Structure formats: C-alpha cells, structure tokens
Amino acid sequence: MRDSTGAGNSLVHKRSPLRRNQKTSASLNKLSLQDGHKAKKPACKFEEGQDVLARWSDGLFYLGTIKKINILKQSCFIIFEDSSKSWVLWKDIQTGATGSGEMVCTICQEEYSEAPNEMVICDKCGQGYHQLCHTPHIDSSVIDSDEKWLCRQCVFATTTKRGGALKKGPNAKALQVMKQTLPYSVADLEWDAGHKTNVQQCYCYCGGPGDWYLKMLQCCKCKQWFHEACVQCLQKPMLFGDRFYTFICSVCSSGPEYLKRLPLQWVDIAHLCLYNLSVIHKKKYFDSELELMTYINENWDRLHPGELADTPKSERYEHVLEALNDYKTMFMSGKEIKKKKHLFGLRIRVPPVPPNVAFKAEKEPEGTSHEFKIKGRKASKPTSDSREVSNGIEKKGKKKSVGRPPGPYTRKMIQKTAELPLDKESVSENPTLDLPCSIGRTEGIAHSSNTSDVDLTGASSANETTSASISRHCGLSDSRKRTRTGRSWPAAIPHLRRRRGRLPRRALQTQNSEVVKDDEGKEDYQFEELNTEILNNLADQELQLNHLKNSITSYFGAAGRIACGEKYRVLARRVTLDGKVQYLVEWEGATAS
C-alpha cells in the first residue's frame, strides 16, 4: 500500500513490517563516477534531528529522522515513522533544500557555477547539481528551458512503487532516460562468490541497497540485481524470491527492458509458495490444503504458470501434494517430527533455483552460500577446508537427492545397503560424521534447494541417508574408483557402513555373511585397502575416519535426544593429550512434540 506524504515535496512510502538486518558498512570510496574520475570522499551534510528520506532495500524512500551520525562509516542512525530504527548509508539518504542562502552541489559540495558546468536546481527538492556531476549529465538546453527539471533522485521517488514503476506519463519517460546510465561503476563493485551481494550495498538503477532473495531481478548480461519497484516491464507484482525470469536491464539493452517468464513445474510452484509463506508468516510448517493451496489459488495469476495455467482448481492440490511427497530432500513433512502429516515446510529456506542457463554456473556457489537468513539467527561459517570438502561431496550427493532415478549400478549398491537391518537412528546420524566442522542441523545456511539436505536436517529416511552416504564415499575416492572393478564396490561399501555403525561386532559379522557370499579374504583385503585410501584422502582436512569411529559416543551424546528430533550444532573439535577426539555440541534444548 502506498501513501503520499508531503515531506520536502517528495513521494514517500509507509514502512512495511519487513526489516532487513544491519549490514557491514561499505567501502564506498572505491566507486567511480561515470566520467572515469574518482569520487571525492563525501562531506557530511547531515545534522542530528534532521528529517530525511532514506532508501530501503526495496528501492523505495521512507521518511525518517536522523538520531546519530557515524562519519567513519558514512552512515546515519535513522528512526522511521513506524518507530523502526536502522543505520542507513549516506548515499541512500536524500535531504531537502538547505535553509542557508549558499547553494552547493549535492554531489561535490562545491559552490562554483560556470559554463559548461553550471549549477542546476531541481524543481522538486530544491537541491543543486552541477551539469557534469549529475547522472546522466544535464544538457545545456535544460538551463535555457522554462520546463520543470527533476533530479535523478526525485524522478525515482515519484515513479517507483510496489509492483513496478510507472509506465506512462512524463515522469515515466524521464525514468526511462535516467535508467540508460547507472550512478556508479559496475566494475568497481566487490561481489561475493555467487554474485548475489556486494560490499558497497549498491544495486539497481537507483544505486540503493537490496536483498536478492526478496523481490529483485538479475540481469542475465551484467548480473546486477534490480528492484521490483524500479523496473517498468512487470505486468503483475513479483513474489518473494521469484527468479524464474529472463531479464535484461535498460543499460544492457540500450533501451526498454526485456522480460520473459520461464516455465514452471509443480515442484517449483510448491517451493516458491512455501518460501513466500515462510517469509510472510515467519514460520516453517504450513497446512498443505488450508494454507498452501489457499495461497497458490489466490496468487495463481502472479505465478504466471504458463502451460499449467489451464489446470482446474480442483486438480491443483493433487499435483502439489505429489510434488511435496516426491521431493523429500526439498520438502519436510510434519510426520517426520511427530506432527500432522499434512503439514509441509522447506528443509532449507531458500528461493527455488530457475532452470535457465544463466543460473547454472551459479549453482555451486549458491549451494554453499551463507549470505541470507530471514530469522535473524546467527550461522557459523565453516572453514575453507571443510567448505571445499563439502563442495566435492555435495556434487556427488546432488545427483541422488533431487528425485532423479539413479543408474542401474548405483541402484544395485543402494539396494544391497538397504537390505542390512541397520538401526535407522544410527544410519541417519552417520552422514554428519563426514563433516564435523560444518553445521549439523541449522536452518541458517542458505543451501540450494537442489542440493542434499541430509547434513542439515535429522528427519531424512534411512534409505535416503544411506544413498547420500554412499555418494559421499564415492566422491572421496573418486580418483581411485575408476581403477577398480564394479564387483568390489557393492561388497566394500556396505561393509564400511557397518564398521562405522553402532551394532555389535558379532552382529555385523553375521549380517556380512548373509549379504556377501564371496571370498571373505578378498573382501577384507578390499575393505582395508579402501579404508586406507579414504583415510589418505581425508588427511588434508584432518577428518580421519578412525578418530571419528573412536569418538562416536562423545560426538553424539544421548542418542535418545536425537531420536526425538532435537536439533544440535557442532561448535568445536579438539584432540586430547591421549589422542582422543572430542566435540562440543550445542543442543537446542527442546525435543519435537
């Protein structure tokens, strides 16, 4: 909902309840002007108690009052109309005309006004700009004309709105002209590995802050992110985290924006709507019929389902429920934590990944990113060594966790492993042993929805976990696997799983004789050789398998707490003087009811 409030003749919006977390201050001095000259360090032109307009992460301006000023970080602490508080960078704050008689340029803070770089006054906010300081440069014809001229900030303030910017009218045409150039240099932005956040907090045509996982579009050419409120090509308002678009910005197209909707599948619809519900209601589980389907039907047009658009409303629930049950590594049922079976939620709260080529190259970085979380709960950052191991393992586990059928040979291995009467509890716990430095069970890390979620949730079934575990061992000894025959692997890998379990040694020998009836001497030799290879591969990451086997009891603690669904995190690892490996585990403190 928009609200026009007069504040310095600018259009402002009432703050929504959604808050963005305070971010690290940016190194703004590295940004360059469009003419290639380095920008001067901005002088502080703000005062405590001053009413200003602050641009938020949705691209809109909100009215607030400055309470504190941090010159070192170039930011102001602002209290908004709804009593919310936040630090805002100077670059995202707009002030009205100063009361003093001196007119200075808003950009360079200089007073001179000489051709061909004269001072031009905005007819909306009363701020002054040099012709060459403003982006884009102000043409000399504007000075001689009697027509009203609006600065870049005022053009965006009067045209941007929720659901998309204005498409018609003189201000809309002025916005299209402004969007041909950016007020910053894209080359100077310092991006993360997944190209989703930058240090300068500079996005879109407006140069303001942004959150890629909310309502933003990424240009498939320059990879910059753009606010929903600033683009003029949308026919319907966006959903949170909806990236199923092929989008080209006005800068790359040298004209109007290009937008094309990508096809959706039922699993994408279920994932996208569950993600939106979790953002809106701040909870994880939703009734599949009363809440999820109600949201899907109410927002059916905003989903742009394409080929699925003609599906009758009475048949939609059947398709959605099938997707929820088929993609168990993506969706979590309530029965897994002893709740009602018709409750569903996302295992990892991240937006769905679009299937277009532009995002395929980003799948790997996104799977290991830790940039965003909506709950505001801190997430531990794994070490670089464990992250590299995780990447290698997730690549292998990914093929078996997205619902795609495994190959005939892999299926044979899984079947032989599933035949073992292993304790379901011990099987589901074992995958976390491979990566003790990573977080065992948190929702804070933003993994890709297509990656294996076994490491982050403790409610996966025994068959799924066994499949993921086999994938891990195959990934760890991938370089040596090619030199072995296929017959030795089905025998060696289940044997390795039993040695790492918690069943008695005698029971393991009995099960081994039932499953594998080949030459035992040859099998033992292959196991010892395989075990040695895995230990050698893990030596660089200091994750020795024998240490883990000897410290299973110390690592897991009370098995009953895990069986009840209590979540935990591994905080630290140490080696005692007598060579024992111990882990510091943080329990959530409450079991699932």
UniProtKB/Swiss-Prot annotation:
Instruction: Indicate where this protein resides in the cell.
Output: Nucleus
Residue ranges of the TM segments: none
Question: Where is there biased composition of kind Basic residues?
Answer: 12-22
Query: What's an example GO BP annotation here?
Result: epigenetic regulation of gene expression
Similarity comment: family membership: Belongs to the Polycomblike family.
Q: What is known of its domains?
A: The Tudor domain recognizes and binds H3K36me3.
| Protein name per Swiss-Prot or TrEMBL | Metal-response element-binding transcription factor 2
Organism name = Mus musculus (Mouse)
| Gene name as annotated | Mtf2
